Amino acid sequence: TGTEVDPLERWGGRMTSVIEDNDPAYLPDGGIAFVSTRCQSYGRCHNGRYTPSLLLHRVERDGSRLRQISFGEANEADPAVLPDGRVVYTRWEYVNRNVTKFHMLWSTRPDGTGAANFYGNNTERPWMLSETVPIPGSHKVVALATGHHSFSTGCIVRIDPLIGQDEAPPLTRITPEVAFFEAERYTGGGCYSTPWPLTEDLFLAAWSPSPIPGQGKKPADNYAIYLVDSLGGRELIYRDTSVSCFSPTPVLPRPQPPVLGSALPRQAADLPSTLLLQDVYLNMNDPKGEIRRGDIQALRVNQLINQPA
């Protein structure tokens, strides 16, 4: 982005936020997924503060065909490509729900179709999952469990989407000594950041012995790179005493995920969207099974109108 073919366009005709493009991820079809403030919207709880939302976009590698592919309201972050070609990312979702608890994982096809809950959209603990990375040779992913009002540090977790899409069973704590910030407690020693899986049980990550910094507090400058395992081991790999170290990333080839052809019809902007619901009675909002088949007579569909920045 920012090349001669990028007009730095702001969607909706508004020019109230500086354009910021973050978190790029290479797509199997040659494009790049990233999050951007070009949507010119912001979360409703920010009360006039300059905190524009970053939503999922994509662009071709030559800078052409830059477009928004997710139309949420609050921030999205950390897109990564799954082994099946879909994109997994963090989405802050608070339509008709608590404003701070649901920053969880969604997935979408690279063209923006098929957006769905990947894990946690009806899960209250942890409050947020971020920095998701697929585990090599596995269908599982590793992520960072953190809070709403915190620097992006916390507990390393592993998620198995084949077990389920919500609640505790699909989630394994790799570093259980680190609490879920805000959801369980606010203080405690040590925290992790930027985990990168080598296997299902071995990870590179940044670690600090200092507590998780809350909103408005400066994180400690003592993060170093460690090798972490699922049995509680932590071995120092590299430390710089003058600055924190983050984002350890192995430089090696990996299998390319399949290219998912676009499912968008021609002139899609002029057509109604389609919502697929397989069985309304299979949901997380009736744990006791009190709703009987035949009771539901209608569905309510909300249209999300973004709040201008």
Where do the protein language model's features map onto the residues?
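Loop/turn-rich, solvent-exposed surfaces of beta-rich toroidal or solenoidal domains
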Residues: 90, 130-227
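Surface-exposed loop and turn segments in beta-propeller and other repeat-based domains
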Residues: 1-15, 67, 115-125, 164-186, ...
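Short, conserved, GDST-rich strand-edge loop motifs in beta-rich repeat architectures
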Residues: 1, 10-11, 34-52, 89-103, ...
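Blade-level signature of beta-propeller repeat domains, shared across WD40, Kelch, NHL, RCC1
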Residues: 220-265
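Asp-box/WD-like beta-propeller blade repeats and closely related beta-sheet repeat scaffolds
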Residues: 1-47, 51-58, 62-77
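Surface beta-strand/loop "capping" patches
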Residues: 182-183, 190-194, 253-298
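Beta-propeller blade signature
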Residues: 1, 48-63, 102-113, 155-166, ...
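Conserved beta-propeller blade repeats
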Residues: 16-31, 73-88, 123-141, 181-198, ...
